[in-house]
Structure formats: C-alpha cells, structure tokens
C-alpha cells in the first residue's frame, strides 16, 4: 500500500517542498509506519511506500483539511 501521510488532528497531508528524495518525508513515514516504510516528496506532500494494508493514509473520512 502507498499513500500520503496524514495529520490525524486536522486531516491535512504532511507538506514538503523538496520534491523527490526527501529526508523529512522518509523519517516521518518510518516513524508512523515502521522502519520498512519508504517516503519521498510528491506533489508537495509526503508520500509513503511499502505500508501495511491497514495503514491510515490521506484522506481521512469525515475530516477535511482546513
């Protein structure tokens, strides 16, 4: 599974500005989903890869980013 890492409180994606390989996104994806996860910056959001099927990613149901 793949997807954008999401802030559970406001429903927003984690933003990033350095597209492609991005240490911040990789670190945040691994903190949330485990050391087997990958991450990079895609369309100014942190995109996480190699996730388990039940991983919660953006968008959250009933929560819109404001």
Swiss-Prot record:
Single GO biological process annotation from the record: defense response
Cysteines engaged in disulfide bonds, as pairs: 12-65, 16-41, 25-46, 29-48
SMART domains referenced in this protein's UniProt entry, alphabetically: Knot1
Entry's Gene Ontology molecular function annotations: sodium channel inhibitor activity; toxin activity
Localization, UniProt: Secreted
Record carries keyword Transcription: no
InterPro entries found in the cross-reference section: LCN-type_CS_alpha_beta_dom (IPR044062), Scorpion_toxin-like (IPR003614), Scorpion_toxin-like_sf (IPR036574), Scorpion_toxinL (IPR018218)
Record SUPFAM superfamilies: Scorpion toxin-like (SSF57095)
Keywords: Amidation, Disulfide bond, Ion channel impairing toxin, Neurotoxin, Secreted, Toxin, Voltage-gated sodium channel impairing toxin
Tissues of expression: Expressed by the venom gland.
Record-listed Asparagine amide modification sites: 66
Function: Beta toxins bind voltage-independently at site-4 of sodium channels (Nav) and shift the voltage of activation toward more negative potentials thereby affecting sodium channel activation and promoting spontaneous and repetitive firing. Acts on human sodium channel Nav1.6/SCN8A and with less activity on Nav1.5/SCN5A.
Similarity comment: Belongs to the long (4 C-C) scorpion toxin superfamily. Sodium channel inhibitor family. Beta subfamily.
Record comment regarding domains: Has the structural arrangement of an alpha-helix connected to antiparallel beta-sheets by disulfide bonds (CS-alpha/beta).
Other remarks in the entry: Is neutralized by the single-chain antibody variable fragment HV.
Stated name of the protein: Beta-toxin Chui5
